[in-house]
């Protein structure tokens, strides 16, 4: 069992039951999935960009991402339907908890001028989104072997009904909120 998964069962669940007064353990919010998404609009000109991004996401997530394709043609962006324009990977279960552990304890402290993540990035339904400007904050990525700095979006989906419940859940996982 992953370290954060054990931590969730032993420390987070009792803490949230006490804070919000849940009657059942099944009412306690939990993280269902973490989605990593890399939008690569510049990949229209060069197919090698997609391969490098897929390689980076594979190292970061520990599983192979799916290449996302354009749903419809947009002449202004010079893309046609079916063009590869991004890569995404969905993490669940053990891989999700291991990624969350690495992200909170190792990757976030490596961000330059880091003062904490925003507490306002919740969507109103208990899900949290965070944008990472450069993939080199992850220790799996070797700085000398990357071709370009790429950002990615990390979406944390929870079963929480409100943003307050979701924030309490993530804060109990030692998420460094600044406000």
UniProtKB/Swiss-Prot annotation:
- Xref: PROSITE patterns: RIBOSOMAL_L5
Q: Does the keyword Oxidoreductase apply?
A: no
The record's Gene Ontology biological-process terms are: translation
Question: Gene3D superfamilies in the record, alphabetically?
Answer: 3.30.1440.10
PANTHER family noted in UniProt: 60S RIBOSOMAL PROTEIN L11-RELATED (PTHR11994)
Q: What does this protein do?
A: This is one of the proteins that bind and probably mediate the attachment of the 5S RNA into the large ribosomal subunit, where it forms part of the central protuberance. In the 70S ribosome it contacts protein S13 of the 30S subunit (bridge B1b), connecting the 2 subunits; this bridge is implicated in subunit movement. Contacts the P site tRNA; the 5S rRNA and some of its associated proteins might help stabilize positioning of ribosome-bound tRNAs.
| Quaternary structure note | Part of the 50S ribosomal subunit; part of the 5S rRNA/L5/L18/L25 subcomplex. Contacts the 5S rRNA and the P site tRNA. Forms a bridge to the 30S subunit in the 70S ribosome.
- Kindly provide the name given to this protein in its UniProt entry: Large ribosomal subunit protein uL5
Q: Which organism is it from?
A: Burkholderia pseudomallei (strain K96243)
The opening ranks of the lineage are: Bacteria, Pseudomonadati, Pseudomonadota, Betaproteobacteria, Burkholderiales
- Gene name, Swiss-Prot/TrEMBL: rplE
């Amino acid at each position: 069992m992953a370290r954060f998964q054990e931590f969730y069962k032993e420390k987070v669940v009792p803490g949230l039951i006490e804070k919000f007064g849940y009657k059942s353990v099944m009412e306690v919010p939990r993280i269902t999935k973490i989605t990593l998404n890399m939008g690569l609009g510049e990949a229209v000109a060069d197919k090698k960009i997609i391969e490098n991004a897929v390689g980076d996401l594979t190292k970061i997530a520990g599983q192979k991402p799916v290449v996302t394709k354009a749903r419809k043609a947009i002449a202004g962006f010079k893309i046609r339907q079916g063009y590869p324009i991004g890569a995404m990977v969905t993490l669940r279960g053990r891989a999700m908890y291991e990624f969350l552990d690495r992200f909170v304890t190792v990757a976030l402290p490596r961000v330059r001028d880091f003062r904490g993540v925003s507490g306002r990035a919740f969507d109103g339904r208990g899900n949290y989104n965070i944008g990472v400007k450069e993939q080199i904050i992850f220790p799996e990525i070797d700085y000398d072997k990357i071709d370009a700095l790429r950002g990615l979006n990390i979406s944390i989906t929870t079963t929480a009904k409100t943003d307050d419940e979701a924030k309490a859940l993530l804060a109990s996982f030692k998420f460094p909120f600044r406000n």
